[in-house]
Amino acid sequence: MGVFRFKRFNVVNERSAMKVNTDGVLLGASMTIRPSDRHLLDVGTGTGTIALMAAQRLSDLICRPQPIEGDVSRPEGVSITAIDIDEASATEATENFRNSPWADMLSAQNITLDAYSATLAPEKRFDHIFSNPPYFDDSLQAPEQRRNDSRHTSTGL
C-alpha cells in the first residue's frame, strides 16, 4: 500500500492489520480536541493515524501553526499513548510516530486494553480517550486472521 500523505505527516501503511481508511480519517478530523488536553489515549491505533491527527490538532491549537513544511511547533507536556493488540500494527505506529514532527509526544505499545489498564496507577487520568473500534459481528471473514482481529468485535480490544 505504501505511504499515505497527510498535510504535515506521512503514514506508512504496509504491515498494520487495519490500513488507513475513510472511517479513521473522518474520526480523526471530527474529534473535538481541547487546548487543555495533555494526556490522550488511542485504543486500537493500527497505523497510528488518529493519534497523529490528534497530535497535529493539538500542535495547531496550542502553538502557532508554522507555514513552512517540516517546521512544526511542538506543544510541551503533551503525551499521546497508542495501544494495539496486533504487534505489527504497534510497530508500524511506532515508526510512523518516530517519523512525524511530534515524535517526542507519541508512543505506541503492543498490549490489550485490559492489560494496559492493569499497568496504570489508580490516579492516572486521560483528558481524551478515542478509538476506532472493531464493529463487525457476523460479517464475512477475511482470509487473514490479523485483519479479522482488527475488524470484528469478537476479538475484543
Task: Name the predicted role of every residue range.
Residues 133-157:
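Mobile active-site "lid"/loop adjacent to the S-adenosyl-L-methionine
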Residues 48, 52:
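Glycine-rich SAM-binding Motif I of class I
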Residues 102-115:
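Conserved SAM-binding strand-loop segment of SAM-dependent methyltransferases
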Residues 79-84:
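Conserved SAM-binding motif I beta-strand of class I
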Residues 37-44:
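Conserved class I S-adenosyl-L-methionine
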Residues 93-94:
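Conserved SAM-binding loop
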